[in-house]
């Protein structure tokens, strides 16, 4: 069985990387002889993927077509490759299936025109090959693109990761060709590298992990205010009496991108005094998801500007205060995981300019500590339910491919 897997290309985004790891690993347990062609940016990404799924799984690197913006000619040629050459080439490869992993790349949150190209490609591919959208948050779409999306997605097998998205595509796109499942990252990763805690001198449950997202514009237009609020939040945590013997782990969950978390973390860390730095562990190395999950799961709780950083914390049975900028947080964490109580709606200039965001985080921390054991128990129970949904999803995909 030969399967093309898309949207895992950058393994330094631990969210999409974890989804790719888990799909490949758990699918291969059903069909051990499967060959996975995975679109990846580099050989380094290929080696990182191989290390996380294990050596016996057959993975072939498929080079990713990159958008080139150096000049008008290269820009036009790269768009031609995406619009015409790539769909044709994929069809000619005779794959048994094409699997496009989530989360929210089929929406207008990040780019309007790119989603039109993606939708067109999906439509072309689905006429010739079985196409699966897995672990997805689809939409929102606006204007004529709603009708366009409905047309392009009509022949595709869709597996959503939350009920809110199901409500949206039922009401707004008038579609019903989907199953409601859960995010692939809720499954256990194949490996858990807890030795990373010793490397950073982190003692279990004696630290708090913070992921300040590098996607600043999703929260506020003021970089200066965004960074200064994170500095205040961290300084305040260090001063709190109840955390006097705790460290702060500043963890990058998305790296080596224009909006990589390491950029904000370095800026924040460099403003701290030498004494404050003794209490803060800066983690901006290119770790593997099995290492970042060990860090997130080993702490008391996390505060995360990356949704999959929060998911990894929850997956290990610990609470995470999630700073939301889109509906995916409400759907995946609020509705699927039933932890709306740990979400802060953090998008808006006013929150960061006035400092209200710090007050909101303080209130959530107080609430979390007051209900800590109860919340942990509920998280473990709900994660177990979501794991079963993800396993069902992978088995259903395998059955549909086999019966083609």
Question: Can you say where each PLM-predicted feature lies in the sequence?
Answer:
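Active-site anion-handling motifs in enzyme catalytic cores
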Residues: 1-404
């Amino acid at each position: 069985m030969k399967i093309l897997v898309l949207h895992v290309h950058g393994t330094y985004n631990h969210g999409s990387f974890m989804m790719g790891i888990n799909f490949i690993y758990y699918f291969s347990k059903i069909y051990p002889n499967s060959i996975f062609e995975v679109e990846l940016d580099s050989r380094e990404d290929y080696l990182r993927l191989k290390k996380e799924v294990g050596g016996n799984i057959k993975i072939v690197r498929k080079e990713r077509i990159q958008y080139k913006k150096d000049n008008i000619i290269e820009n036009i040629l790269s768009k031609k490759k995406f619009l015409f050459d790539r769909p044709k080439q994929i069809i000619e490869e005779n794959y048994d299936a094409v699997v496009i992993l989530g989360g929210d790349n089929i929406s207008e949150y990040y780019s309007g025109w790119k989603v039109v190209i993606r939708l067109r490609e999906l439509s072309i591919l689905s006429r010739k090959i079985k196409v699966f959208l897995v672990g997805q948050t689809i939409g929102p779409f606006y204007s004529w693109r709603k009708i366009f999306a409905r047309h392009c997605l009509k022949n595709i097998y869709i597996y959503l990761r939350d009920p809110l998205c199901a409500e949206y595509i039922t009401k707004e796109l008038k579609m019903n060709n989907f199953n409601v499942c859960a995010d692939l990252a809720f499954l256990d990763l194949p490996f858990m590298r807890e030795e990373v805690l010793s490397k950073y001198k982190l003692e279990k449950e004696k630290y708090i992990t913070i992921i300040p997202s590098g996607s600043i514009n999703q929260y506020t237009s003021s970089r200066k205010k965004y960074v200064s609020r994170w500095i205040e939040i961290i300084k305040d945590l260090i001063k709190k009496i109840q955390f006097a013997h705790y460290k702060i782990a500043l963890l990058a969950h998305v790296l080596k991108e224009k909006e990589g978390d390491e950029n904000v973390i370095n800026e924040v860390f460099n403003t701290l005094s030498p004494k404050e730095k003794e209490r803060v562990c800066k983690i901006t190395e290119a770790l593997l998801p099995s290492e970042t999950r060990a860090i997130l799961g080993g702490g008391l709780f996390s505060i995360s500007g990356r949704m999959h950083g929060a998911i990894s914390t929850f997956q290990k049975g610990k609470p995470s205060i999630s700073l939301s900028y889109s509906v995916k947080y409400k759907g995946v964490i609020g509705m699927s995981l039933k932890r709306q109580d740990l979400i802060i709606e953090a998008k808006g200039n006013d929150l960061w300019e006035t400092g209200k965001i710090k007050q909101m985080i303080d209130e959530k921390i107080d609430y979390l500590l007051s209900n800590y054991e109860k919340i942990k128990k509920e998280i473990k129970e709900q994660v177990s339910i979501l794991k079963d949904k993800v396993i069902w999803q992978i088995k259903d995909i395998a059955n549909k491919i086999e019966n083609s």
